[in-house]
Amino acid sequence: MTELADILRARIAATGPMTVAEYMAECLLHPLHGYYTTRPPFGAEGDFTTAPEISQMFGELLGLCLAQHWLDTGAPARFTLAELGPGRGTLMADVLRATRGVPGFHAAMEVVLVEASPRLRDVQAQALAPYAPRWADDAGQLPEQP
């Protein structure tokens, strides 16, 4: 039995059943025993990798598609560029690098990252420092704008 299992048992004994969402949040984000808070989950040292970690092409193509959509919708003066579960920030960095030559795009965007892990927020802050991203704990905190 792991320490986290003991913590979960004690919590259930004290407060009763928990939802699957609460259980998963504890397993993934517990400050001392959570998957995303205690180890690097990505790449060679982690358990999995994603397309943006292998090649910048996906992020760059996505960025150009987003910029074209922004232009096609009249280039709104403000819009939110959000990513849910941004990992190390690699995808967003690729998107932003590919779009830096699109006049007005970066000036109009607000970069918001939906991330619950403090450790990953620190990694994302380093990767995206020039763009001053802000963070939200869940998608319900995203701004009401395009």
Annotate each PLM feature.
Residues M1-L84, R88-E144:
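Rossmann-like AdoMet
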